Amino acid sequence: MKAKVIVGMSGGVDSSVAAWLLKEQGYQVEGLFMKNWEQDDHNDYCPAAKDLADAQAVCNQLRIPLHTVNFSKEYWDRVFAYFLSEYEKGRTPNPDVLCNKEIKFNAFLNHALNLGADYIATGHYAKNTIEGSIGYLFKAKDREKDQTYFLHAVEPEALSKTIFPIGDFTKPQIREFAKQLGLVTHAKKDSTGICFIGEKRFKTFLNEFILAKPGEIKSTGGKTLGQHDGLMFYTLGQRQGLGIGGLQNSTDEPWYVVDKDIASNTLYVAQGSQHPMLYSQGLICGPIHWLADYENHLPLTCFAKTRYRQTDQACMISPPDNNLHYVMFSSPQRAITPGQFIVFYEKNQCLGGATIEQIIR
């Protein structure tokens, strides 16, 4: 009998088609819906309830069972606590990376294995190969939608227990499959933003958990230009929401965030999208989580992304120094952001990644 696969059903079109593709390939397919966040229940509109209803409708259409599980505690402890602590330090975290590492490819994987699954599957745009107990990660066919950036921190052992059914298809193909099948999710919009914030304004949401500390906005020359609402609300390269237009003796060029001084609680800004302070020659990152056997080949010349959907950038990774790596780029990089992740590639293979600790101007 063919292997049993439990698909993480999000209530979206990608996981819906992933489940159908696996069924077509002859696997024993079951669905599982994860609830990772409790606090949307008091809203008039509850996205989790709608997503569950859509996941159930798709499973009914495909005639597969749907399990449900609540990982809210695990999510709070392993993802959200980290998210808050990073913002309190004035950094800009990426909770999606942690959610994949800790919840989808850890808590969900273990739960599925306990339910008798041989593999899990998700609707991620990615590909993998499996050699024994190790999985290797590769970019999806649809480079616009490729999600390996968010998957770089998953353990290789977890990747060996994972199937990515939609990795060889483009998003338009996936939508067309869903439409032809008459799946209720075929026209559902892609989810964007941070999953647990939903429709709330980001500032309003953060204020519920962290006390904001307003401070001064200064030019790179040290001139006070205004007040910020709290460093946690701003990210490097940000242009909108600074509230400092129309200053005397300044041009009409827009202002951008170029630095955050945590010690003095100062936000530094500069004018012009090409201002030198927006650019970095390199960065210092933490320990690299390797998905391929390259750690003994340092220094290494390869490619990297410092944010999702960025074009791959040529770089060189240094050997570790006190668990930190220097990464230097072939050309200056704009708005590298501490707290975010740098992810390394060699052609189509994702080699792994690390947290960005500092920028090197």
Curated annotation (Swiss-Prot):
The record marks H124, Q340 as: Interaction with tRNA. InterPro entries: MnmA-like, MnmA-like_C, MnmA-like_central, MnmA-like_central_sf, Rossmann-like_a/b/a_fold. It comes from the Bacteria. Residues 94-96 are annotated as: Interaction with target base in tRNA. Residues 145-147, 307-308 are annotated as: Interaction with tRNA. Transmembrane segments: none annotated. The keyword Disulfide bond applies. Keywords: ATP-binding, Cytoplasm, Disulfide bond, Nucleotide-binding, RNA-binding, Transferase, tRNA processing, tRNA-binding. GO terms for cellular component: cytoplasm. Its EC number is 2.8.1.13. Disulfide bonds join C99-C195. ATP binds at G8, M9, S10, G11, G12, V13, D14, S15, M34, G123. It catalyses: S-sulfanyl-L-cysteinyl-[protein] + uridine(34) in tRNA + AH2 + ATP = 2-thiouridine(34) in tRNA + L-cysteinyl-[protein] + A + AMP + diphosphate + H(+). GO terms for molecular function: ATP binding; tRNA binding; tRNA-uridine 2-sulfurtransferase activity. It is found in: Cytoplasm. NCBIfam families: PRK00143.1 (NF001138), trmU (TIGR00420). Catalyzes the 2-thiolation of uridine at the wobble position (U34) of tRNA, leading to the formation of s(2)U34. HAMAP family: tRNA_thiouridyl_MnmA. PANTHER family: MITOCHONDRIAL TRNA-SPECIFIC 2-THIOURIDYLASE 1, TRNA 5-METHYLAMINOMETHYL-2-THIOURIDYLATE -METHYLTRANSFERASE. This is tRNA-specific 2-thiouridylase MnmA. It comes from Legionella pneumophila (strain Corby). The lineage of its organism: Bacteria, Pseudomonadati, Pseudomonadota, Gammaproteobacteria, Legionellales.
